[in-house]
Amino acid sequence: MAAVSCSDDVETVKLEGVTLAPTTVSMLPAETTQLTLTVQPENADYDAILWTSDNEAVATVDEAGLVTAVAAGTANIRVEVKEFSALCAVTVFAGNKLADNAQVGDFYLADGSLLDRETDAATITSANAIGIVFTTDVTRMGEAEKEALRAKSVEPHGLVIATRTPRQVTDLFYWYMTPDYDSSRDESEIGLPKLWDNFEEGEGKEHETYALVNNDLEGYKYNMAIRTERKADFEAGYYGAIKAAADFEIEVPAPAASTGWYLPSAGQWFDVLRNLAGVELSDTESSFFLIDDYGNFSWMNKGRVNDILNECMAHVADNMKTPYASLGNQDQYWTWSTVSDDQARIIMFDNASFVYSWWYRKYFQWSVRTVLGF
């Protein structure tokens, strides 16, 4: 007869590992996020769970895995169970909203977060504001920049214009000029269109030309074409305005989740004035008129455009902005938009109520103000 043995011992299940979800999280100050711990196997035996933050000035965690964002920066949240551990990387942004909730007029910060346009003045002044959102209409973004953002796993949200201009040796830049003063080059060889309907005949087709300029949204694409297809001459400084826009990255680094700074197109400048200054720019209103038979047109009765733009960034710290009309009553900015081998378009506006879309020879020197996609 076999012996029967009775025991009160219960077999323990050995812990084999732990995981955390999510493993990365982006937060705004005062937000909370619950982390979920999973043990393997799920019926493993363990006595205690230890949660810690390596930077409690940025984010704290309680005994249940609830993370609270404190201030801008990064922190690693660690959970330890016996000899096993797992991490969650936390990024806390400086703003009070993220790109998903962007609105025209919001302040774009150096870390890629935003301050709502209604944020109090003191907070805006103390923040590292580098730009202002001028459109959240992704149909007014160039296809190339949307592709560039998606390649970074960033869904396109809109466009930002810089609050300050490049502060290099000069505030003014030519569009293209070689050391021997040659300012003519056919950029259609590398895909840049010429934005003047019927240029060769010198006929004033203002509505057709307006349509070309208004729908010119591929600033990023054509900046990249110059930077890559004309690389040697670009790096040598022949493309003054486009290189100034690229070099602005050194002065004001763009967030990783953006396209980086570039020289805007004429159509993008139209959207800046429409959305930030409240200016209607169409070819059907009574104030639209052709300046001459060479593709130049303008509008009048648009109010104090410079003052309105300055009001948009009134609370940005002085060292982070360049006021409009800082060189006088009128602003003149280069766009990437070529007209012919030796001409490119500029945008001009002033406090006398005029907005101009003109072309100038590429050896003229005008200002540069950059944009980026986010």
Residue ranges and their predicted role:
Residues S7-D9, F93-S258, W359-F374:
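Short, compositionally biased
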Residues S7-N96:
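Extracytoplasmic soluble-region selector
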Residues D9, A266-F374:
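C-terminal, surface-exposed recognition/capping segments
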Residues V39, T259-G260, A266-F270:
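Extracellular/lumenal glycan-associated surfaces
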Residues E56-T60, I132-T136, W334:
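Exposed, tryptophan/tyrosine-rich binding patches on extracellular proteins
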Residues L66-T68, A257-L263:
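A glycine-rich, coil/turn loop motif that links secondary-structure elements
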